């Protein structure tokens, strides 16, 4: 290769050694690395092409194809002293970060990445400390590491970046177990020959366990103790003199058998608190028990693949889940069967194999025949690989699936998923390009329709466009196309959307800062813009838009400073509201929220305490024992609306008592203490809630995926759910006073009583009745806070309590039948049964 090709790229290059050869016809292997030797430094140049190229030389020419170029400079002792991402920033600058090491080769300092305009050729080694200080506006722009002065070089302290954190570090102390010091005292648990837990009378000998004490920037301490096999034996979190201990107990072969969480130390009940695991003679997990649940059993075939499994609910019905494999070890059939325990125990003597036969025979007429007998099998999943011969089989032929034009050897090509809650099936097929990327995907729908997705990719594999065609059995059809645009560094910049013959809409536009962080979002052809800001540690500090804004404070603001990443205070403005509202937060030593003090105005000193939440106690497992919640009690009054006392059986909520007698104003959100019994909540063998008498839920039924299939209320109302075997929700049926509303979820098309109503988009939805776009404005956790239409009019405002309850909702015009229906449920049933689903209010 001609050395002149690298002139201006890296100075003083003496030679180039090609380490990786790549093919110009393939976009899968898209990086080329070269070792570069220089008179004073050496480095590795990595070029990742973004376009198809004709040869390696074209990647290094300034007029060649688009590519990403990285340079790593060595320090001469095997470490990397500097990494440079050449021209990667939005303004085309080099993003550079530097590293320094001590005399033993340990990382001593790491400078934050900084965008630098190269002097001379891009990719040159740079001195960036001063540039970083100027860019960030902080003098402390280096993470620094301190080590023990010994041959072990154990990390003692890590000082993070940011002037606010000067002198604050995440520190570690290395010690051992000592019986004389309470914080370093360790119980000794053993596993008997019969697999039972035994607490030894003789503790660990002093010094037999290696101990590490960690302390974060706020002084919260955590001990970990390891045995001679480097297995974690004890994890201890300290809250003053109170210890929260989790013990890990191993058998003589090193298998984890018991996990004993903090609650067990005060109430040594294995059934309620312990995680229990058992193994066979080949160290395969055969028994698993979670706290408060019946155990699950696992059975393997002769080549160690899971063949049968059974949870507590299945055991009550004498059922087992089964898995059948092809000759390559791929799962081809899943389902449930009624095999006897005796038959299941002999599974380890055989190799389970599913053979694909001709015709509609075998398990569920799928064509697969199992080598092992299955009693009354009910098939939930069927998978086909390598070819598209399944197209003519039972079920597929009704949908006219096309033949594949590119070899799919080694890939999943088709599948059948049962619909839990009905007798139907979902049929699907995937088609690939030569690089094994899915370029076309077809799937039938619960309403008899079909969805087709066709995807075009860039050279390096990013989607450029997705064409979606949806049909249903009535003849209705819908077509939508997403188009994606990327910048020179392959960052997503624009998302356009068009459905049917309507004009294309610039749905979303991204702008990034020089560090690659999202800086601005623009929705709806740029009409609505949201700006984002971050602190020096890349923690989100601000979301700023005309309809929703939010400020997050960590070490500054009105609350007690938190240096470990907890939010100390938060303010927001929603909809047309001009007055900031917010919370000041307090935490205990375990990082659990204890107080959320509400206020309004810039200093949160107006209308204080109106929507406070206070946790009056936690148990050792982190369950809330008491909660006080304030809210609106009249047109002008605010007071305690919930004063809750919660009791548990292990981790299961057993009873809730509300000592507050003041109801929330205008049927607002609050806990409804609907009954006073010693047990108000009941559960099944798998730990699923089956009764919630406070919410008048007299029965909650579940399918084999442990997903709720039906919720029944005391007044005769009910909600039923339909899922496919992968757990995707397909249908919801609400029965209210004898009237039914059926909601079908056909991909991103939502039907109400057979009529298409909503087309979900990446940033909201389109109401299909009028063709209007609606946009969801989200907070830092992804909650939908404001819904606006395509003209920027506010349709809905949601404000939340600190623990997630809906503090206040201000609806505008009802924008969908889902929203209208949800509000009618709230009026008739109350807030006690409400959840948020797809950004809309739904009952559960």
Enumerate the predicted regions with their spans.
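A residue-level detector for well-ordered beta-strand positions
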Residues: 71-72, 99, 145-147, 172, ...
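Carboxylate/His-rich catalytic cores and anion/metal-binding grooves
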Residues: 166-193, 225-226, 233-234, 239-263, ...
